[in-house]
Each structure stands twice: as structure tokens, then as C-alpha cells.
Amino acid sequence: MAKQEYKQLPKRAEIHSATEQFKDTIKTSLGLDLFKGLGLTIKEFFSPSVTIHYPMEQLPLSPRYRAVHNLQRLLDSGSERCIGCGLCEKICTSNCIRIITHKGEDNRKKIDSYTINLGRCIYCGLCAEVCPELAIVMGNRFENASTQRSQYGSKSEFLTSEQDAKDCSHAEFLGFGFVSPNYNERMQATPLDYVQEPSKEESKKETPTSPEANKGDENV
């Protein structure tokens, strides 16, 4: 075990007279420590301000910011992406998602109710990560204050409007839970494909040999 060595500081001399106390006060007040603190204060006083005037000004949020959820629609037809599989409800650690479904005439699940209790949600993003249809994603709307509890979690609050999906004003989500670009080619490729592809540096180093050089090697 390492031995701890402590450095002993010199003990401050005791002050007995008023003259010594006055000298100590002047030394402490007009010392370098005072001017260092004043210099730092003056430097920060003239530095550019980093304060924003909220709510008139807002900082840009990251695409992977996890705030109030969004329920997506298909951009071509405007239909809901959710298929009612219930994976988001099962994986939710806060037990705040509730889905009620029924079987339709085409033997497919139809969603009757989809609610998220935002008072219990911890915005972990597991529901968006496990969704196979990319139907639920984490949005960037963090201003969700309300005086009524009933406004926290209704489906109409999360669902993207059908008009936004059909007029192409709603783009695909590129944040938390979104698949990486060119994912189809990457999934079909095997590890050997990556090995067989030569890098640019290796292709530059490899120079083709001339036929005359090959003939000379054969004669030898």
C-alpha cells in the first residue's frame, strides 16, 4: 500500500499588537491575490455573453435528443406505422405505455387506444429502439407543461397529422431509433466482402509488372 506523505505548512505567526494587525490587513488587502481576483472579474465582464433569452431564443437540439414521443405515419399513404405488436409496452421500464387492440376483419390488429403516461416516463428511448416499424420515435418537444393531467399521454398528442405525411412536409426521423444509412447493403454483405475490398492506399502501392520482366524471370 502506498504511503501518504503530508506536507506541513508553516504556522502563521500570532498577532499581538494593533500595529501588527494593521500591517497584516494591508498585506492581505493589497496583495497579489486581490488583484488576481479583480483581473478575473474584469476579464469576464468584457467577455461575450453566452446567455440566451428564453423563450424568445432557444438553443438547437441534437437529432438524438429524447423528449416527447412522436407516432409516425407512412409518407406515401399516410397510414399509421404502428402494427400493435406491443413490444414498446413490454420493454417499458416505467410501465407507462398502454395499448388496447382488437382483431379486425382482415385478421390484423387494430389499435383502439395508445396512451403514454408522461408523468411516469423517464424518456429512456427503449420503446423507440425496439419498435420494428419505426412507428414510435423520440421527438424534441420538451415544452409540455399543462394544468390538466388528461393532456399527458393521449394518442392525438403524439400522432403525426395525416396532412403532414401526404404533402411531404414531414421528413423521415433521423434521430434516436433510426436505422443507419445503406443498412440493406451492410446487412447483406459478409465479413469476407470487407476483407476482399482493397483500400485505396494498397491499390496505389501495387504496380503492374511488365511482360518483359516476367520473361526475364522465366529465363533465369
Swiss-Prot record:
Q: How does it assemble?
A: NDH-1 is composed of 14 different subunits. Subunits NuoA, H, J, K, L, M, N constitute the membrane sector of the complex.
Record-linked SUPFAM superfamilies: alpha-helical ferredoxin
The protein depicted here goes by the name: NADH-quinone oxidoreductase subunit I
* GO-annotated molecular function: 4 iron, 4 sulfur cluster binding; iron ion binding; NADH:ubiquinone reductase (non-electrogenic) activity; quinone binding
- Enzyme Commission number, as recorded: 7.1.1.-
Task: Note the superkingdom of the native organism.
Answer: Bacteria
Which reaction does this enzyme catalyse, per its entry? a quinone + NADH + 5 H(+)(in) = a quinol + NAD(+) + 4 H(+)(out)
Taking the first listed entry, what is the main subcellular location of this protein, grouped into a coarse class? Answer: membrane
What InterPro entries does this protein's entry cite? 4Fe4S_Fe-S-bd (IPR017896), 4Fe4S_Fe_S_CS (IPR017900), NADH_quinone_OxRdtase_chainI (IPR010226)
Q: Which Gene3D superfamilies match?
A: 3.30.70.3270
Database matches in Pfam families: Fer4_7
Annotated positions binding [4Fe-4S] cluster 1 = 82, 85, 88, 131
Q: Which family does it belong to?
A: Belongs to the complex I 23 kDa subunit family.
Mention any one GO cellular component term assigned to this protein in its UniProt record: plasma membrane
Known role: NDH-1 shuttles electrons from NADH, via FMN and iron-sulfur (Fe-S) centers, to quinones in the respiratory chain. The immediate electron acceptor for the enzyme in this species is believed to be ubiquinone. Couples the redox reaction to proton translocation (for every two electrons transferred, four hydrogen ions are translocated across the cytoplasmic membrane), and thus conserves the redox energy in a proton gradient.
The biological processes this protein is annotated with in GO are:
aerobic respiration
Q: Where does [4Fe-4S] cluster 2 bind?
A: 92, 121, 124, 127
Q: Return the cofactor note field.
A: Binds 2 [4Fe-4S] clusters per subunit.
Cofactor(s) in the UniProt record: [4Fe-4S] cluster
Disulphide bridges, residue numbers: none
Source organism of this protein record: Helicobacter acinonychis (strain Sheeba)
- What are the entry keywords? 4Fe-4S, Cell inner membrane, Cell membrane, Iron, Iron-sulfur, Membrane, Metal-binding, NAD, Quinone, Repeat, Translocase, Ubiquinone
Task: From the Swiss-Prot or TrEMBL record, state where the protein is found.
Answer: Cell inner membrane
Ranges for the region named Disordered are 189-220
